[in-house]
From Swiss-Prot:
Homodimer. This is Cytidine deaminase 2. Substrate binds at residues 84-86. This enzyme scavenges exogenous and endogenous cytidine and 2'-deoxycytidine for UMP synthesis. The gene is CDA2.
């Protein structure tokens, strides 16, 4: 009988440790299911600001000292966070905007759209408004851009959503491809680099190739992907996301670093020990030099390798056969490279 209090105390300690561990994990959470978001107070889109402080705490702004958070809801019901990321020792044009982070987060989780967006424009996270012009361009290239709503909220007021189309209309030429649309670039590794295991092996260059096959590069046709490995053996990936306006484009290293920030639970960039870039040989836009500059600066002990790829004509033909839709008028739709 005398042991029961000790057993109860032990169980209470275990419960406390579990709760603390769960809270620590939640601290670095960038993706919320609808139920998880509801537990954070986001029961409908107008309450997206309830997650903004959590987002701002996750921002990495050692240079600008200005932490920005963004919270968005997809049609799946999941809620995503975006944060700004500066890279110590690098010019600010390499930085990632919070809205870019959020859209990349959506892409890495294979979401199809972004329905509602709240971006903090004050350091206290109480005021919400229009994204910067750079990010508006990025957002307008999504397939549902005309239906997307942006929260406008002065301090201590309820706020309301406005249509994105009113902020930046007609930025895409008719027939332009859209961000977040499913893509397969039909790439294969060139030469001896392709002689590795099977398509589902875990080699970092195979993961980088898979990322490159998801890359959105319809204007320069220079798809590329990056895979990273940290000191604990965890891997991350990202791909080049191109904008019709050029400058808002996000490189594959930055996209992979979005994945790293979102899933590494607070690790510093110097914990990245390996990186692989896969891109086309003689691509009109090469990522190699930029990737090396970024990784040499933020992860000086990282082993960086580059492998080249090319379009596999047999895969491309098979892909076209499987995805091409021909309507009764002979028009071709559903084709994305």
């Amino acid at each position: 009988m005398a042991q029961r209090p000790n057993l109860l105390s032990h169980l209470q300690d275990l419960v406390t440790k579990f709760k603390n561990m769960t809270m620590a994990q939640d601290r670095f959470k960038f993706v919320f299911t609808a139920n998880e978001a509801a537990l954070e107070g986001v029961t409908d889109p107008i309450r997206l600001p309830n997650l903004i402080r959590k987002a701002m705490c996750l921002a990495r702004a050692p240079i600008s000292k200005y932490k920005v958070g963004a919270v968005g809801r997809a049609s799946s019901g999941r809620v995503y966070l975006g944060v700004n990321v500066d890279f110590p020792g690098l010019p600010l044009h390499h930085s990632i905007h919070a809205e870019q982070f959020l859209v990349t987060n959506l892409a890495l989780n294979y979401e199809k759209d972004l329905c509602k967006l709240a971006v903090a424009i004050s350091t206290d996270g109480l005021e919400f408004g229009t994204p910067c012009g750079n990010c508006l361009q990025f957002l307008m290239e999504m397939s549902n851009a005309l239906d997307m709503k942006i929260l406008s909220k002065p301090k201590h007021e309820a706020g309301s959503f406005s249509s994105l189309r009113l902020l930046l209309p007609n930025v895409l030429p008719k027939g332009s491809p859209f961000l977040l649309e499913k893509r397969y670039n039909c790439l294969t590794l060139s030469g001896s680099a392709g002689e590795i295991c099977s398509l589902d092996c875990s080699h970092l260059k195979r993961r980088a190739l898979a990322a490159a096959n998801n890359s959105f590069s319809p204007y320069t046709e220079s798809p590329s992907g990056v895979a990273l490995l940290d000191n604990d053996g965890n891997w991350y990936r990202g791909w080049y996301i191109e904008s019709v306006a050029s400058n808002p484009s996000l490189g594959p290293v930055q996209a992979a670093l979005v994945d790293f920030v979102a899933r590494s639970r607070g690790k510093m960039f110097n914990k990245i020990v390996q990186a692989v870039l896969v891109e086309k040989n003689n691509a009109s836009v090469s990522q190699e030099r930029t990737a090396k500059i970024i990784l040499d600066t933020i992860a000086p002990n990282c082993d960086f390798k580059v492998f080249h790829c090319s379009v596999d004509c047999a895969k491309r033909l098979k892909y076209l056969r499987e995805t091409l839709v021909i309507d009764t008028l002979g028009d071709y739709t559903g084709l994305h490279y």
